[in-house]
Amino acid sequence: MKSIDPRHYDVIVSPVVTEKATMASEHNKVVFKVQSGATKPQIKEAVEKLFDVKVKSVNTLVRKGKSKSFRGTFGTQSDVKRAVVTLEEGHRIDVTTGL
């Protein structure tokens, strides 16, 4: 059994399960919430090692935190970095069943 570097678990925070992410899964794409300092090569390596799939490309985006009012005080939600991972043909990841 091959060993998995524990740092890969720090790069991938969680899968994103939204309506838009579910529609993207029909086109061989998976969306993950990733660490804010993670680079595309790190994300690609982590997904390939953790899920045993081949990654075609990685696109990243940062969703800026919204300003919200809670009980009369204003605050800001945290920024979230997401990675849209496109898989090679024939490879699939089912994030709805859990890790």
From Swiss-Prot:
Any Gene Ontology CC annotation: ribosome
Keywords, ordered alphabetically: Ribonucleoprotein, Ribosomal protein, RNA-binding, rRNA-binding
The keyword Ribosomal protein is assigned to this record: yes
Stored PROSITE patterns: RIBOSOMAL_L23 (PS00050)
GO molecular function terms listed in the Swiss-Prot or TrEMBL record: rRNA binding; structural constituent of ribosome
GO biological process, one term: translation
A Pfam family of this chain: Ribosomal_L23
Positions of disulphide bridges: none
Listed PANTHER family: 60S RIBOSOMAL PROTEIN L23A
Subunit structure: Part of the 50S ribosomal subunit. Contacts protein L29, and trigger factor when it is bound to the ribosome.
Family: Belongs to the universal ribosomal protein uL23 family.
Functional description taken from the UniProt entry: One of the early assembly proteins it binds 23S rRNA. One of the proteins that surrounds the polypeptide exit tunnel on the outside of the ribosome. Forms the main docking site for trigger factor binding to the ribosome.
Protein name, as recorded: Large ribosomal subunit protein uL23
Species in which this protein is naturally found: Rhodopseudomonas palustris (strain HaA2)
Organism classification: Bacteria, Pseudomonadati, Pseudomonadota, Alphaproteobacteria, Hyphomicrobiales
This protein's encoding gene: rplW
